[in-house]
Amino acid sequence: MKTKPSLWLMVIMLMFPQIVETIYSPVLGSIARSFSVSDAQAAQTLSVYFLAFALGVVIWGVLADKWGRRPTMLVGLLIYGSATFIAMQTDSFTILMLARVFSAFGIAVGSVVTQTILRDVFSGHELRKVFSLMGIGISISPVLGMLLGGQLAFAGGHQLVFLALFFIALVLFVYNLCQLPETQQVKPKIALGCLVARMFKDRQVLLSALLVALYNVALFSYYQLGAFIFSDLGLDAEQFGYSGIALGLGSLIGSFLNKRCLLNRCHSVRCFYWQHCY
């Protein structure tokens, strides 16, 4: 019998990487001022974050099969928390960049391992309903991240944001240490090279990857540049944070439509078009 983790924990672990990405955006102006760097240099701390996050998704996915889900999750959270603490303490922009790389690499564990755990314990229509619930949580994440980031940036700049992230990471690490079960039943032997080759030959996989990539490019371009545009317009970080409401609304509507389609067993193509209207 499979041991099922708390669904609320799984929702939080999927939401946290999204919150981490968006909570940082309102403090880019504070980063530029505090470290005496240009806006473009401050924005690079987000660019390296996204690259390291993508690398982390691949590596943590492999390690989750090799080490198990629970130890992989704990190691990733430990790396993230340590890197965030360093980012909070440093006065060097170079160290900040390195800390951002390691924090992104670490927190990627929340995205990939959580989904792996869900696939361990759910299947079929039940799995689709669970992922629909997760989608609603993820769609709310940018709103929470932008709003919280705007308020923290206005109150205490980037150091207060990093302090909040470190505290959340510490709480999640302790909770996972105490409550997260190991859901891996067997350790599969996967020929990674053959799997990658099959994925690159699958037209549907490539189209889905392209769609996700285009969505993320559009969204993260706003996270990277929006704070500076608002500043040029005479608006502060707190006001920039409120713009996250508009960003999250479309994703939230799409997630609700997806859940409705799954409950009513609508045709997948029709569901796809309805969701992406938003």
Question: What are the residue ranges of the model-derived segments?
Answer:
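Juxtamembrane intracellular "pre-TM" segments in multi-pass secondary transporters
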Residues: 181-208
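Conserved MFS/SLC helix-loop-helix module at the cytosolic interface between two early adjacent transmembrane helices
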Residues: 54-94
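Central cavity-lining transmembrane alpha-helices of secondary-active solute carriers
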Residues: 47-60, 245-257
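Extracytoplasmic gate region of multi-pass secondary transporters
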Residues: 205-244
